[in-house]
Amino acid sequence: MTASAKEEYGFFGKWWQFAKERFDPFSHSLMISLFIVAHYVVVAVDLGKKFPADFGGEGAWRHFALALGVCAFFFKLRLYDEIKDYEVDCEINRDRPLVRGLVTHKDLYSGIAVCIATEVITFGLLGTAALVAIVFSIAYSLLMYKEFFIGEQ
């Protein structure tokens, strides 16, 4: 990608273009919504409550925080995958955003840091149990990113 093409997108534009290409907003929003609703159903059944839970009123911010945190988690997994697949993409998928220069490795590492911060903040707002759960999830995702530190066979 040329410098003028990078300038054409701008900071937010390049991330929006990346998301459109590699983290389709519609399909991922649907998947994340179903993921969250499934968890709400499990909790409601476990607590013997009816579903759906109260989504309005003063507690609505909690649902928004949860959705934002879960979205950040899944987006972070996409960023990990982009970095891990870079060498293969250079040979096979030359149209990918990282390979063609829409985003850089530094951009993706910065995006990962922002996602982790978003996860910690949003889940922290939801209470200690949620914070502990996301910290374990982040740790596990980092192990996955490093493939459990297993070298190539």
Segment roles from a protein language model:
Residues 1-77, 84-94, 110-145:
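Hydrophobic alpha-helical transmembrane segments
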Residues 83-86, 98-99, 151-152:
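Catalytic micro-motifs at enzyme active sites that drive phosphoryl/nucleotidyl and oxygen chemistry
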Residues 143-153:
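Juxtamembrane membrane-interface segments at transmembrane alpha-helix termini
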Residues 92-105:
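Juxtamembrane helix-capping/reentrant segments at transmembrane boundaries
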